[in-house]
């Protein structure tokens, strides 16, 4: 098994430090939680909604990382994948711009088909996003980002086996104001972001936000247009309506458009299958079509087809809240629609070997109603949830090897799922608190799959009632039990058992060379045994949080690619590890953050392409991961200068569940830096930045097609990017 060494002296000091440290609704005008101070000499509290009510982060008995507006800005976190650099245990895989899937503590879903839901759930202003293809590339005008590690099977429930990520946008308030940012960078980057807040009356306020992202392709294609460019526009319009002293409604309209981006961000590498069928890199050898890339630079490629990516995402959310002396009623209604066109050169070579296209449509409606209340030592929350979504996809493939003509895999997925949940919390004493919760989910799904190949000897039309397994229902019970102990002020110890589940489904094979009985797979279930601590010390100048966990993972939905056959199989797994997060203000205006993650995953039996089984590690689960950030501000030129550096180091990791030699990503580090000046009135700011300062080459995804084409194709993280941003802010 893959192992990585870690400096023992650092581990010892962190453990010692952890042992020593163990010795209501916002007002109408409030738009953001109190930012973590980087200009004062003490840490401010961070407000989160990890339990669907506002709490101090240090009072929540769970492993949570949160970024407020100030932190997002000073770290220069702009894209939805940038946050992985400062969240212990968080990775991501991204098949170009088309699909983004987070990996938290090794829990993920590597299937690139759009109909799959991810086990790390994404919430946008309390609304669950079921489609992995709907996650846009840009974060803008956010109040907060929260990352909750571990199963969230009670209050959030749906498919949050590994955890969840919440994006909370800035809301309209009663004061006029706004901002505008303009960025110019290398690769022709031209980006802008802005927001304008305006009260319309004593009871109505509006906020409009937008972001545009454009850059030329990172990959130089000697045969045509550069690859991996971006041309995206996103916007959000919100109305906040105060209907009475005790109630308000928030209406949000939002949309994203990606226009004619060049997709297929693959880099080619020669490979051959070994005796087990897993790929081994064979540098210098041509692939099966006779091609060999002479360049060792992954950003120099030769592809005969220009890929394409068009996407439109739009939706609406209505959030209502009614407060009484006894309880608060909250309603969240959400509608989301996605349309996508995607095409790629799958073989990554200048020869016409295999092209793959996707035409994808998705729509969902969800509704949540919940009540929460309590008095004295007792607090409670109960609610119901319903989601209905439909997705359809056509995946035509073209290849000279198609003896019976080009083919098209067509499939449609429908899901109707109600759920009910409840959680109670009781203070046993001033120091002890007990918490218990449960959720029941009914998942009613149907799948219609057609492999359309008119000249083929036989075709497969997988649909009920001809195939009864094409219509399935699942009864999922999840929940948690937790005990919290406060031995002293500003210190919390907790222990919990959490159970999460993700519904079963179907593989959506694009080749059609598959038996009907291999399409369905069962739900996965994860039980998390966890202990942790949270502490604030050194006169509110230091914060240290830590956790240890053990995952018992039943029927993990593992993704396998055998030739052109894409299949999901249930396998058991275990996963254990922990995290530490340290935040310091050692000097006035100096902020230091440090994070550590350790993982040990084990899958006893995976399927091998050549037959048989072998043990493996979970994909994208490095044994060690470190992140750090330092930010300092000082007065100069009548204003404030700021400087910051941050980065992340990952030990070696496998990118696919097959654990082949070709998908082993060696350890690597990525570093970023930022230098800025802010005017005395806080209206103007100018900043220069560089990301991936050392221009480190590292892969975030790998696809083993060695047995089919004689190569593997990978997706690399962005190269070095740099530029400057000018910002103007007005009002509050």
Per-region residue spans from a language model:
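Gram-negative outer-membrane beta-barrel transporters
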Residues: 31, 379, 427, 434, ...
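Periplasmic-side early beta-strands and strand-to-turn transitions of outer-membrane beta-barrels
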Residues: 166, 174-175, 183, 194-294, ...
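Structural signature of Gram-negative outer-membrane beta-barrels, strongest in the C-terminal barrel
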Residues: 240-244, 371-372, 377, 383-387, ...
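N-terminal Sec signal peptide and the immediately downstream disordered periplasmic leader
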Residues: 1-87, 197, 245-246, 316, ...
């Amino acid at each position: 098994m893959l192992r990585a060494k870690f400096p023992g002296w650092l581990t010892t000091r962190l453990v010692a430090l952890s042992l020593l440290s163990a010795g209501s609704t916002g007002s109408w005008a409030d738009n953001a939680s109190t930012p973590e101070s980087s200009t004062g000499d003490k840490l401010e509290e961070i407000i989160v909604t990890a339990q669907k009510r506002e709490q101090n982060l240090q009072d929540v008995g769970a492993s949570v990382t949160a970024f407020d507006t100030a932190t997002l800005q000073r770290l220069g976190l702009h894209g939805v994948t940038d946050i992985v650099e400062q969240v212990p245990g968080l990775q991501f895989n991204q098949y170009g711009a088309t699909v983004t899937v987070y990996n938290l503590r090794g829990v993920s879903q590597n299937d690139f088909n759009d109909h799959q839901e991810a086990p790390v759930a994404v919430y946008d202003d309390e609304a669950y996003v079921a489609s992995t293809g709907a996650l846009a590339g840009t974060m803008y005008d956010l109040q907060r980002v929260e990352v909750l590690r571990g199963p969230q099977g009670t209050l959030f429930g749906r498919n949050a086996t590994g955890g969840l990520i919440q994006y909370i946008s800035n809301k309209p308030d009663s004061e006029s104001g706004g901002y505008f940012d303009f960025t110019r960078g290398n690769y022709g980057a031209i980006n802008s972001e802005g927001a304008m807040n305006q009260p319309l009356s004593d009871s109505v306020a509006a906020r409009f936000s937008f972001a545009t992202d454009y850059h030329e392709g990172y990959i130089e294609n000697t045969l045509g247009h550069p690859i991996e460019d971006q041309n995206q526009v996103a916007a959000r319009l919100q109305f906040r309506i105060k209907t009475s002293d005790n109630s308000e409604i928030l209406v949000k309209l939002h949309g994203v458009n990606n226009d004619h981006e060049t997709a297929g961000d693959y880099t080619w590498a020669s490979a051959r299958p070994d005796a087990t069928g897993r790929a081994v890199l064979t540098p210098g050898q041509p692939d099966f079509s006779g091609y060999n890339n002479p360049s060792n630079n992954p950003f120099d490629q030769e592809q005969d087809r220009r890929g394409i990516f068009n996407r439109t995402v739009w939706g609406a959310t209505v959030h209502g809240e009614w407060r009484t002396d006894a309880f608060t009623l909250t309603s969240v209604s959400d509608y989301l629609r996605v349309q996508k066109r995607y095409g790629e050169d799958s073989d990554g070579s200048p020869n016409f070997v295999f092209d793959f296209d996707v035409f994808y449509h998705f729509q969902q409606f969800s509704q949540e109603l919940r009540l929460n209340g309590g008095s004295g030592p007792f607090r409670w929350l109960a609610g119901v949830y319903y989601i209905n979504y439909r997705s359809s996809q056509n995946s035509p493939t073209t290849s000279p090897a198609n003896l019976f003509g080009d083919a098209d895999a067509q499939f449609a997925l429908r899901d109707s799922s109600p759920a009910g949940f409840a959680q109670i919390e009781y203070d046993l004493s001033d120091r002890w608190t007990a918490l218990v919760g449960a959720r029941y989910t009914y998942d009613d799904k149907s799948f219609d799959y057609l492999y359309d190949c008119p000249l083929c000897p036989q075709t497969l039309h997988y649909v009920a009632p001809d195939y009864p397994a094409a219509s399935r229902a699942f009864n999922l019970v999840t929940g948690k039990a937790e005990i919290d102990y406060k031995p002293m002020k500003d210190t919390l110890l907790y222990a919990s058992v959490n159970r999460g589940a993700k519904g079963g489904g179907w593989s959506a094979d694009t080749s059609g060379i598959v038996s009907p009985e291999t399409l369905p797979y069962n739900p996965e279930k994860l039980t998390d045994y966890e202990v942790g601590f949270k502490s604030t010390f050194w006169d509110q100048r230091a914060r240290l949080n830590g956790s240890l966990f053990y995952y018992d993972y039943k029927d993990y939905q593992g993704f396998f690619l055998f030739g052109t056959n894409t299949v999901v199989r249930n396998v058991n797994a275990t996963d254990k590890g922990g995290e530490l997060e340290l935040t310091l203000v050692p000097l006035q205006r100096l902020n230091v953050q440090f994070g550590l993650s350790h993982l040990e995953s084990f899958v006893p039996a995976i399927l091998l392409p050549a037959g048989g089984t072998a043990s493996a590690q979970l994909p994208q689960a490095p044994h060690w991961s470190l992140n750090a950030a330092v930010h300092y501000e000082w007065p100069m030129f009548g204003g404030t200068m700021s400087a910051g550096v941050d980065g992340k180091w990952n030990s070696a990791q496998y990118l696919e569940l097959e654990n082949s030699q070709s998908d082993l990503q060696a350890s690597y580090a990525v570093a970023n830096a930022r230098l800025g000046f802010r005017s005395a009135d806080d209206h103007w700011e100018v900043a220069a930045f560089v990301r991936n300062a050392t221009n480190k080459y590292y892969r975030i995804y790998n696809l083993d097609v060695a047995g089919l084409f004689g190569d593997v194709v990978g997706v690399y993280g962005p190269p070095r990017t740099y530029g400057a941003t000018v910002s103007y802010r007005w009002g509050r």
